[in-house]
Amino acid sequence: MRINVRVIPRAKLNKIEVQPDGTLRVHTTTAPTDGKATADVIRMLAEHYNVPKTSIRLIRGETSRDKVFEI
């Protein structure tokens, strides 16, 4: 399953919002340096979908706010 994600780094709270078009907006308190925000997003997605972190793979958007993950 592929998931389109819009990442909001340096947010006040960690949360996941489902948009009407099916994409996810993931708010993370982590700064977008050295892939730390992406790692935090993977952790949050793993908790949200109740899967191990190792089963989530970044397909596109390593340095972008718009990312595509595969579970």
Locate each region found by the language model.
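Absolute protein N-terminus
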Residues: 1-2
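Active-site-proximal or metal-binding-adjacent scaffold patches in catalytic folds
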Residues: 12-15
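C-terminal structural segments of small proteins and small subunits
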Residues: 34-35, 42-71
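Compact, glycine-rich, soluble single-domain proteins
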Residues: 6, 19-44, 48-49
